[in-house]
Amino acid sequence: MLKEECKALLDALNKVTGCYRHLVLTIGGTSDSQNLREELKKTRQKAQELAVANRNTLTSTLKDHRLTKEDKAEFERLWVIFSTCMDILETDMRRALVLGQEFPLNIPKKHLIQTGMSGGTSGVAARAMSAQNMRYEAEHNIDVMDLKDLENEINLMGEMMYEMEMKVSVPQWTVEAKQDPGAELKSIMSAGASSPGIISLDAHKSICDLSKILAGVVFSAVLIIAIVLAVCVVKLS
């Protein structure tokens, strides 16, 4: 039961961290707005709440000497995944801080970047918050005020990760993966290969091979023509 609870918490953190990264990538773009900055703040806070819950559960579990060898190996694997999520979250928080400083909303220093993206980001934020719709209630200067909070939270995140390493030492290279690299992606591709509009991995590979062959033939033909022309020029001269 505890194992399933840890997996559920980790899945939730994974989802929210992914949504946060998606939102961070839109800072400074044409989709940037006050609503986006509020979505970033709420999503970041949700991720930190889940991070604390994951840390508490996994730390107390891994310090339990009654764990069997199999259970310990599984929880260590979950710990490594959790640590990776934390690294990603901290990296994205730092990126959000830099971009937020470069692209303030009310006193713009630079023009917004034409990224090609359009539309709002409320759907992504709502998914992270597990809500149907987002409610916006932030002040107009959230783009400036939140940067101070974000900077403090980055420092707290670093302290939290340091404390984690001191309490539980699980070297990543000692944990064995349960699947081969890319196994999950391959299973998703094979499962969706029969769906309409989805090209299978093998078909995609065949198309790529055909394109390479065609490119090689065209290049060879151009090279031969160039050689013939060069010979003709030499003879005529």
UniProtKB/Swiss-Prot annotation:
Intracellular or extracellular location(s): Membrane
Transmembrane segments annotated in the record for this chain: 213-233
Keyword entries, A-Z: Coiled coil, Membrane, Signal transduction inhibitor, Transmembrane, Transmembrane helix
Membrane topology recorded in Swiss-Prot or TrEMBL: Single-pass type IV membrane protein
GO biological process: detection of light stimulus involved in visual perception; G protein-coupled receptor signaling pathway; negative regulation of signal transduction
Residues on Extracellular side: 234-237
Taxonomy, superkingdom: Eukaryota
UniProt record similarity statement: Belongs to the RGS7BP/RGS9BP family.
Function: Regulator of G protein-coupled receptor (GPCR) signaling. Probably acts by regulating the activity of some 'R7' family protein (RGS6, RGS7, RGS9 and/or RGS11).
Protein name (Swiss-Prot/TrEMBL): Regulator of G-protein signaling 9-binding protein A
The gene coding this protein: rgs9bp-a
